[in-house]
């Protein structure tokens, strides 16, 4: 049996302001730093240790990982960063307040943009300053790989090849792996692992800063999964995520 731990980064400054973030490189809020620290302490108390870690190229995930590894006294382990673990690209919605967007377009439309598997938000133009092609961290990507907007399926289509080519073989080799990423890149991975339907994934929220453990068989098929937190805390944090797209959302 193998175990892999998935962790959504702690609350970011734009999570705090209830804004669509996507590929915007926003740092952790003070609360997010504390969430990351608590995650590290929880993993340490539960006896978890890691041989290597995977994360995105966005600082809110990277910093969460740093803090967790610091708590575990494992800052020396190899860390692999890939744009394929980035948050879903929210197109022209990036930077907009979710509650104000719900007021303008309706809560149902915002829920569809945020949660559906196959609907893309309005796209960026290539001359928009927010276009990732202007960012040096994506200099090695082809124009086709750089998104103007993404739905969840698009996100899955970049996450899963990285899982299959790089992360899965690492787990199969016997290494203990930690993945620190984002709400939608992790939702995509969970959809793949648990073979969830489009409707099931639309209702799935992953809370910030709570380790999610997957126990996998030798073929990396899930045996079971669980959060390292009590049910009430998980429920409360999931509701915070869900309420972000509502007119009164203020998470």
Swiss-Prot record:
Gene3D superfamilies noted in UniProt: Phosphoglycerate mutase-like
Disulfide bonds: none
Catalyzed reaction equations: (2R)-2-phosphoglycerate = (2R)-3-phosphoglycerate
Annotated SMART domains: PGAM (SM00855)
A Pfam family that the UniProt record links to this protein: His_Phos_1
Major enzyme class: isomerase
InterPro entries, sorted: His_Pase_superF_clade-1, His_PPase_superfam, PG/BPGM_mutase_AS, Phosphogly_mut1
Official protein name in the record: 2,3-bisphosphoglycerate-dependent phosphoglycerate mutase
Lineage of producing organism: Bacteria, Bacillati, Bacillota, Clostridia, Thermoanaerobacterales
